């Protein structure tokens, strides 16, 4: 309808063909696509340029308020601490019980391994007196020392038999001559004293020395056994009124005594001579073994001092003496 409103008699308006909106839109469009277009390339597809969006207005930073955690009450803290202590106590009790159980097991194992019933002297079960010592050469004595240790044990047995035969010889001598009653009484005393003393004073020390390689026990044996050899020589000589049936006593009965008594006394004198000879031989053998072990007198002194100071009896006596001296002052 606008075409009818125009005045056909008016001057015509100059129309610019380049002012057409469709033309201006094309001319204002970005020319990047034309610059990137290559008509000679294999693909004639134009590169699409993404349109960039303008950033929006910046928002002000807002600080979020921090929320404080709730503080525990004193009752809750005390309850938590008590619960922790209870847990620790239970753990300690459990560990203590476990340690006690292991210690008991170790003690039982050690008791089963080391505790042995005494077997010497070998007495019958009905006897009220029980064995006093444990003796086993195969388990306690090293293989290198078993033979010499057994020989010393056999020497002690020969020593006991000789003293018993000496008692019988002195009894026969007393029956043939009543003046020899003193010799018979002393022979009984020697048998009752020297038999156990020899076992305790020189045989047991050498047994302990070979068992544990103890220098102090070696020195005890050497001292006592040397005295024992001296006693053997006195006994084999047979001095009068000493309670021994030696060579002099046996020869004195040949003139005015029965022949049987003389023979018995000479046999006993031969036993004393045999004991003296075996004692010298075994003393030499033990000394050779002693030097082979590397023991010394200084080591024996150290073992003696350690044994003395570790003894409860010695410590008790020393403390009592010190207390008495302090009170006296």
Curated annotation (Swiss-Prot):
User: Membrane topology type, per the record?
Assistant: Multi-pass membrane protein
Q: Which InterPro entries match?
A: SCAMP
Please report the name of this protein according to its UniProt entry: Secretory carrier-associated membrane protein 2
**Which GO BP terms, alphabetically?**
protein transport
Keyword Phosphoprotein in the entry? The reply is yes
Alphabetical GO CC annotations of the entry are: membrane; recycling endosome membrane; trans-Golgi network membrane
What protein family is recorded? Answer: Belongs to the SCAMP family.
Describe its assembly. Answer: Interacts with SLC6A4 and SLC9A7. Interacts with SLC9A5; this interaction regulates SLC9A5 cell-surface targeting and SLC9A5 activity.
* Keywords, ordered alphabetically: Endosome, Golgi apparatus, Membrane, Phosphoprotein, Protein transport, Transmembrane, Transmembrane helix, Transport
Where found?
Answer: Golgi apparatus, trans-Golgi network membrane; Recycling endosome membrane
Task: Tell me the segments the record calls region Disordered.
Answer: 1-74
UniProt key word Phosphoprotein: yes
| Residues modified as Phosphoserine | 319-320
Q: Where is the composition biased (Polar residues)?
A: 19-31, 40-51
Q: Which residues lie on this side of the membrane: Lumenal?
A: 175-181, 240-262
Give residue ranges on the Cytoplasmic side: 1-153, 203-218, 284-329
Tell me the gene name. Answer: Scamp2
Annotated TM spans: 154-174, 182-202, 219-239, 263-283
Q: What is its main location?
A: Golgi
Region Interaction with SLC9A7: which residues?
203-218
User: What role is this protein assigned?
Assistant: Functions in post-Golgi recycling pathways. Acts as a recycling carrier to the cell surface.
């Amino acid at each position: 309808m606008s075409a009818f409103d125009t005045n056909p008699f008016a001057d015509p308006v100059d129309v610019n063909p380049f002012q057409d909106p469709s033309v201006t839109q094309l001319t204002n469009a970005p020319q990047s696509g034309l610059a990137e277009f290559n008509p000679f390339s294999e693909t004639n597809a134009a590169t699409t340029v993404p349109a960039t969006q303008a950033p929006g207005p910046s928002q002000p930073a807002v600080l979020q308020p921090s929320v404080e955690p709730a503080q525990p009450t004193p009752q809750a803290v005390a309850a938590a601490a008590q619960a922790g202590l209870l847990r620790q106590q239970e753990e300690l009790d459990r560990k203590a019980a476990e340690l006690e159980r292991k210690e008991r097991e170790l003690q039982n194992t050690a008791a089963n391994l080391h505790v042995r019933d005494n077997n010497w002297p070998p007495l019958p079960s009905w006897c009220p007196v029980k064995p006093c010592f444990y003796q086993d050469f195969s388990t306690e004595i090293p293989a290198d020392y078993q033979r010499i240790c057994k020989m010393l044990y056999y020497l002690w047995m020969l020593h006991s038999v000789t003293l018993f035969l000496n008692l019988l010889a002195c009894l026969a001598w007393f029956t043939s001559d009543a003046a020899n009653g003193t010799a018979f009484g002393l022979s009984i005393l020697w048998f009752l004293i020297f038999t156990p003393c020899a076992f305790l004073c020189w045989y047991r020390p050498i047994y302990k020395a070979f068992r544990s390689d103890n220098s102090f026990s070696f020195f005890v044996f050497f001292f006592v056994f040397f005295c024992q050899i001296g006693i053997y020589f006195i006994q084999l000589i047979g001095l009068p009124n000493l309670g021994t049936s030696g060579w002099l006593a046996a020869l004195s009965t040949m003139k005015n005594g029965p022949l049987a008594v003389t023979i018995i006394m000479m046999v006993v004198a031969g036993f004393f001579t045999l004991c003296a000879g075996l004692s010298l031989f075994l003393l030499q053998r033990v000394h050779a073994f002693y030097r082979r072990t590397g023991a010394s007198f200084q080591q024996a002194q150290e073992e003696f001092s350690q044994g003395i100071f570790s003894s409860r009896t010695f410590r008790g006596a020393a403390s009592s003496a010190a207390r008495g001296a302090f009170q006296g002052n």
